[in-house]
């Protein structure tokens, strides 16, 4: 910090605060509320802060935010919203393998560059087939080829405008009678770049642009809606095919290999091995199996809270580590099993070890506010996984209900008896599938409505950027570098200091965050 002194009157600056090493090597287990980060020098605006972070060895996100694979947090709607806002969502596995794979497929199909496997119909199909496709896939701009398959002669396209006002008795009409014919279509030649194709699509004012080869056979299609999504969501997390990134959770049992096969077919980018205690022979064997059979899929191991746990998973070949045990708002593992670790200490200790091997860390659990996110990232985590913070958003699974005039959504731990009763996957996560008596490691509850992810996540992003600005770092990479070098200083908080740091001495107040 002394490098940034601008007053010329004195050069003496007393040593102030503790380094991360001093703070966490005292033997105490610390949570995020037990310390603060001391401010630095500001010479830039908050919007200049770069939040780019590594999720795994090969996947980088523009924002360090991840949604937890819980059945009251992440299904396709949440995963799409998280990816559009720069993060990623992990589809839970407290469901059938087919349902989970279909949720992944929804995310991957939501936005694409060149769509090489679109829904295709033939002129002999009927209007009702279009409505069925629309109900199943959410769209009805469907190319028509002579055989109803990709790679055959393009003869037309069917859009919502062609069928909007058809009466129910007309649903048996052949598509060849009502489709927009080939001679009225705007098409682009195979080999065109995505940028050039998008320019043609813009000029044409059409909803879809078929891509055809020299024989007028359909080879791909691009959609106008994807152009609008590119404009509206510049931070979106995408793969090489311009599809949204999507993760999914799996277990470590033999039948999870079938689940993995379906997820791979659906296009999943990364899987997290979902276990409350990841340092097991079952997880080590599963990591090796995935890396051998599906080397392109990134694997996140966990959960771990010590360097010794992390070592075994790193040696097995994980691409990232998930850190946290018993720190979640609905988790009672520490209380029931007497195992776990305060989250701030766990994040620092595992991150400090894993960085030597280039393995990113995901801080999972204990996040109550945007300040906790900033602290987790400052302690070495590359990304932060959130459950309760994202529960009860519009995109979270479940229906809203009212209690005492407050709009709520259900939220439960995957170790709760409620979740274990729903599907075997929750029992597997806690090694309880063979137990006659279940030991709950989580609870069920309710969380107040937070509105849409598209408003809430931008608030979190702005909060992290302002935190980095106060620290004096223009990127999260710089924050971590300052922490490991000892330049970033911390200070422990007494219980009185924590009270002082919150709202106090008011008769009444309204706490609006965004």
Swiss-Prot record:
It comes from the Eukaryota. Its cofactor is K(+). PROSITE patterns: CBS, IMP_DH_GMP_RED. One of its GO terms (molecular function) is nucleotide binding. K(+) binds at residues 326, 328, 331, 500-502. Gene3D superfamilies: Aldolase class I (3.20.20.70). NAD(+) binds at residues 274-276, 324-326. It catalyses: IMP + NAD(+) + H2O = XMP + NADH + H(+). Acetylated by CLOCK in a circadian manner. Ubiquitinated leading to its degradation by the proteasome. The modification Phosphotyrosine is found at residue 400. The modification Phosphoserine is found at residues 122, 160, 416. GO terms for biological process: circadian rhythm; GMP biosynthetic process; GTP biosynthetic process. Pathway: Purine metabolism; XMP biosynthesis via de novo pathway; XMP from IMP: step 1/1. Residues 114-173, 179-237 form the CBS domain. GO terms for cellular component: cytoplasm; cytosol; nucleus. Its EC number is 1.1.1.205. SUPFAM superfamilies: Inosine monophosphate dehydrogenase (IMPDH) (SSF51412). It is an enzyme of class 1 (oxidoreductase). HAMAP family: IMPDH (MF_01964). Homotetramer. Interacts with CLOCK; in a circadian manner. Interacts with ANKRD9; leading to its ubiquitination and degradation by the proteasome. NCBIfam families: IMP_dehydrog. Belongs to the IMPDH/GMPR family. Catalyzes the conversion of inosine 5'-phosphate (IMP) to xanthosine 5'-phosphate (XMP), the first committed and rate-limiting step in the de novo synthesis of guanine nucleotides, and therefore plays an important role in the regulation of cell growth. Could also have a single-stranded nucleic acid-binding activity and could play a role in RNA and/or DNA metabolism. It may also have a role in the development of malignancy and the growth progression of some tumors. This is Inosine-5'-monophosphate dehydrogenase 2. The lineage of its organism: Eukaryota, Metazoa, Chordata, Craniata, Vertebrata.
């Amino acid at each position: 910090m002394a490098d940034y002194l601008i007053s010329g009157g004195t050069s003496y600056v007393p040593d102030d605060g503790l380094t991360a090493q001093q703070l966490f090597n005292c033997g105490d287990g610390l949570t995020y509320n037990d310390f603060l980060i001391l401010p630095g020098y500001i010479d830039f605006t908050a919007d200049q802060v770069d939040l780019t972070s590594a999720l795994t060895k090969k996947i980088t996100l523009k924002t360090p935010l991840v949604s937890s694979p819980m059945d009251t947090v992440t299904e396709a709607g949440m995963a799409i919203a998280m990816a559009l806002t720069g993060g990623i969502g992990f589809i839970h596995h407290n469901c059938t393998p087919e349902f989970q794979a279909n949720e992944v497929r929804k995310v991957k199909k939501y936005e694409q560059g060149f769509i090489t496997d679109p829904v295709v119909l033939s002129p002999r199909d009927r209007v009702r087939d279009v409505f069925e496709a629309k109900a199943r896939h959410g769209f009805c701009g469907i190319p028509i080829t002579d055989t109803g398959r990709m790679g055959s002669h393009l003869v037309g396209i069917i859009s919502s405008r062609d069928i909007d006002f058809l009466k129910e008795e007309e649903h048996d009409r052949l598509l060849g009678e009502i489709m927009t014919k080939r001679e009225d279509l705007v098409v682009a030649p195979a080999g065109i770049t995505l940028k050039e194709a998008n320019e043609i699509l813009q000029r044409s004012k059409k909803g879809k642009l078929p891509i055809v080869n020299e024989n007028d056979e359909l080879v791909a299609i691009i959609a106008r809606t994807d152009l609008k999504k590119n404009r509206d969501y510049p931070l979106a997390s995408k793969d090489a095919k311009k599809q949204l990134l999507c993760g999914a959770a799996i277990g470590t049992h033999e039948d999870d290999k079938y689940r993995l096969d379906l997820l791979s077919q659906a296009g999943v980018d990364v899987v997290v091995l979902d276990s409350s205690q990841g340092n097991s022979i079952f997880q080590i064997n599963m990591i090796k199996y995935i890396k051998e059979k599906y080397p392109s899929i990134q694997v996140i191991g966990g959960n771990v809270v010590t360097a010794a746990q992390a070592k075994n998973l790193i040696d097995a070949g994980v691409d990232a580590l998930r850190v946290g045990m018993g720190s979640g708002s609905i988790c009672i593992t520490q209380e029931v099993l007497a195992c776990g670790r305060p989250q701030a200490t766990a994040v620092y200790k595992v991150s400090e070890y894993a960085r030597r091997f280039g393995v990113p860390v995901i801080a999972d659990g204990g996040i109550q506010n945007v300040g906790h996110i900033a602290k987790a990232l400052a302690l070495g985590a590359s990304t932060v996984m959130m459950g309760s913070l994202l529960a009860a958003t519009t995109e979270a699974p479940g229906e809203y209900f009212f209690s005492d005039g407050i709009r709520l959504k259900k939220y439960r731990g995957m170790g709760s008896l409620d979740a274990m009763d729903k599907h075997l996957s929750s029992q597997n996560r806690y090694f309880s599938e063979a137990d006659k008596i279940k030991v709950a490691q989580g609870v069920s509850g309710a969380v107040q409505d937070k509105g849409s992810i598209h408003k809430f996540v931008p608030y979190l992003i702005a909060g992290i950027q302002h935190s980095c600005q106060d620290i004096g770092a223009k990127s999260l990479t710089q924050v971590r570098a300052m922490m490991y070098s000892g330049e970033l200083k911390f200070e422990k908080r007494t219980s009185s200091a924590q009270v002082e740091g919150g709202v106090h001495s008011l008769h009444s107040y309204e706490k609006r965050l965004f």
